[in-house]
């Protein structure tokens, strides 16, 4: 099997194992490997050089090696030659790379070409340089071994065993050659499967180690190989050396004998590290005796079976990190067009296992290392957490949720510190987030009465004026250690890392967050992400967001969420940035002008307070600098005058932000502030009155001066209602009791009074009273109806009057107690409420009256407001006049209706209809 062989003689003498005068089919033909046709080999024979054995010594020092050297052009493999050039039967002879083995005992050498480098180059580099230069070797005959046909493999294009744009014509050093023992699935340049003797065609390559060479010559490619890092099927049971040589070579050893079939029992233990392809252990060696260079159809079927078995082998033992993608995945070719040629003979065809095919189809364009998507053993909490059904549709982390729902409330009992130094991925942990008191934040769920624990989710959210969502540049980090008392574990929810801790009923659903740190991601990784518009260096404030899902017995899941105060995570010192800890007010009217006191840290005499307003998409629409009282301000306190809002006619509250700024980039986190619209009170045309006229027994009437505000929504000064009584003359008695019901319809006469000192809640009001005598109206007056808040507030001051006695009731206004009192020059008086009456007109009525009632043809604007039904019934069914007692007057309340500036006459009529449509037997003018 391993017969000793002689080295070639320097003079080109004969060597055993070669036939003299070989035909052209027996010669080495380099026309396929190189781009031009060679001259007659006999003409170049005298210029050939003989190569001595390398000094390092191959594994088989007696092997006869023949070399042929010629630079190889990468375009040769891309020239578009048909596969028949490599495998057509009529051109098998001249197209072979390596001649078949000749019968043992043949004498003489066949003509051959030996183009070798200089002797100095051989001594310096040894066999490595020759292999990288594209050497082709001819196998000498084996002594004592029966002749056996040997089919050969062509050398594929350079892309078959190294990356494109590689400077070296041979396979480059693998980036994983020192990590994994996986084999290259591609065709090696010196592979020739055989079924004869086990001797290698290139034994000197067996000792080339798989380490990088320290030399910078073009021997080694500057790029790593994709082929050598790929996976193949299971390994052959043939043993291999346990250690690698320390020689400064850069290539792996290529087997020239164990390519497609298994070795016979007497095979050499020396094994290639990169057989291409690797056969399965159950493939039997071929025993056909075909003299052709390529195997027949039957032998091809065996090889095809071997390749198919390779495709079904599972690469279970290969580490997952060694799987690598390719920028240009090449599918495995279909069945060859020539039945006698196996698939691996065709050029520019990659052999890919099924696992790698799937990876290359779905891989990104760049070459990356694949890692498992999930941990094989996920971290689980030590105590059970109430699990949510998998089919439940939980809201995503981007959705804003309320912190309270029904009886449940998720509350942060202890807020975190406003500054925490986040740690980078390349450095160690900086501990958990702490509280200002020295401990850690505390979160509690209120209103939960079940006995099952729940899971509290924690993630890092944004802290700007936009809607709260997971932060793009920061993630929560799980802290472990001896001082950590809270059980926690990590999981991924929608590409966001979430930390989940238990909320247990035995702890009153209260948890101390001592296991949550903040991790800073690389800005470049996030900013280059598709759709990301934020800038990492400008987005350094975060919030701790807590979320809990509460399953109910009905199957409904209640989700609550609360967020902490903003936390500054930048590397800048905390002493440089101003920080607002408290503000004494958080809202005012649109006019501003109020003073706001800010308490915090790092305030200077040059500190400014700026109010801003932004839209939901972050666009700033308003900015105004507030006035800071520098005389009162201190390093930890600022006195600020709130600026006027840009729009004074708003109808709903507007939320804005403000911040304290010490310099160009030294600003505090934004604080919230709210501007409220001015409360609107509808004012009707009011009458200015003269108290002397009201107090006089005789008068000529009331002067009226209508007052209209400049803007219905902006009240320059509050207007108050002052109730007054128009003078009424009392007539003789004789009115029957049914007429008393008519008198109940006359409401109280009140007058709007423009005054800043009166409060609407303290205005006097007098309730309608029963009249026992027929009355007539002597003077015209106007009346305005006002709400009667309650029966207690609507009280009447009533005095019985004797027959035929007239009196002039007068309303006295007392500025001390801001109440209206009714007085008279007579001891007894009657108070009557009337509406739109004027002399000169007799009011017809069902009951007989002794004197007509005079009505006024003119109508005055009135505001009719509803009166308490209880007061009306009490006035209707009240006791006789003689039994009524004197009651002290009470204040009148004013009802502020919505959209008073849009009230029209139709609305007033509707109120009137509702007012008088309640009790029956009521007549209205």
From Swiss-Prot:
- The ranges of region (Calcineurin-binding) come to 111-116
**Renumbered residue ranges of the record's region Transactivation domain A (TAD-A):** 119-199
Which Gene Ontology terms of cellular component type are present? chromatin; cytoplasm; cytosol; nucleoplasm; nucleus; ribonucleoprotein complex; transcription factor AP-1 complex; transcription regulator complex
Q: Which domain of life is it from?
A: Eukaryota
Record's keyword terms, sorted: Activator, Cytoplasm, DNA-binding, Nucleus, Phosphoprotein, Repeat, Transcription, Transcription regulation, Ubl conjugation
Which modifications occur after translation, per UniProt? In resting cells, phosphorylated by NFATC-kinase on at least 18 sites in the 99-363 region. Upon cell stimulation, all these sites except Ser-243 are dephosphorylated by calcineurin. Dephosphorylation induces a conformational change that simultaneously exposes an NLS and masks an NES, which results in nuclear localization. Simultaneously, Ser-53 or Ser-56 is phosphorylated; which is required for full transcriptional activity. Ubiquitinated in endothelial cells by RNF213 downstream of the non-canonical Wnt signaling pathway, leading to its degradation by the proteasome.
Task: Give the record's subunit note.
Answer: Member of the multicomponent NFATC transcription complex that consists of at least two components, a pre-existing cytoplasmic component NFATC2 and an inducible nuclear component NFATC1. Other members such as NFATC4, NFATC3 or members of the activating protein-1 family, MAF, GATA4 and Cbp/p300 can also bind the complex. The phosphorylated form specifically interacts with XPO1; which mediates nuclear export. NFATC proteins bind to DNA as monomers. Interacts with NFATC2IP. Interacts with FOXP3. Interacts with TBX21 ('Thr-303' phosphorylated form). Interacts with KAT2A.
Function recorded in the entry: Plays a role in the inducible expression of cytokine genes in T-cells, especially in the induction of the IL-2, IL-3, IL-4, TNF-alpha or GM-CSF. Promotes invasive migration through the activation of GPC6 expression and WNT5A signaling pathway. Is involved in the negative regulation of chondrogenesis. Recruited by AKAP5 to ORAI1 pore-forming subunit of CRAC channels in Ca(2+) signaling microdomains where store-operated Ca(2+) influx is coupled to calmodulin and calcineurin signaling and activation of NFAT-dependent transcriptional responses.
UniProt-recorded name of the protein: Nuclear factor of activated T-cells, cytoplasmic 2
Q: Which gene encodes it?
A: NFATC2
